[in-house]
Amino acid sequence: GEEVKWHQDIGFWPHTNYSPLTVGTYIYDCGMEQGPVGMIPKSHDGPLYNQYNDKDEWIGCLRPEDEAAIDTASADYLEGPAGSLTLHNCRMIHGSKPNLSDIGRPLLLNAYASADALPYTHNPAQSKYMETIVRGEAARWAHHDSRPCLLPPDWSVGYTSIFALQQEEA
């Protein structure tokens, strides 16, 4: 399997604040040979990066010059047996190395946000459970973070996958 290049999720589906997080569940055991997800520690507290190239095309990953400025050697790679969970904030820089094994590395991803985090754009990953409140009540007020967020392309006209975007297959 291909690598998943360094990226931040919030650029794919920006919200009024940065509460969204993703919980990943490894379906199979995932060791270094499978290319587990890697996270850059504390990057959720840093800047948001432009995930468009110089031609203003969405690439779904950090630009080479931004990646060069990040200490990717500090990444924590999250290995674990089947059923292990990964958890990351929408601003966290993360990705994975190529899968060098004959074993797949399926990772079930579920995204959650506080009820007062409203999406700015169409979500490309539609689900019958979208906007389901799993705890608490619907918000009466939106919480707006003062830090800006670059908007993605108009996903309502179609979306393939992060893999296709990053491999320039979109």
Where are these regions (language model features)?
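Short connector loops at helix/strand junctions that flank enzyme active sites
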Residues: G1-E3, Y18-P20, R105
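Short acidic (Asp/Glu) patches
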Residues: G1-G11
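Active-site-proximal flexible loops/turns
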Residues: P14-T16, L48, S96, T121
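Non-heme Fe(II)/2-oxoglutarate
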Residues: L85, R91-A170
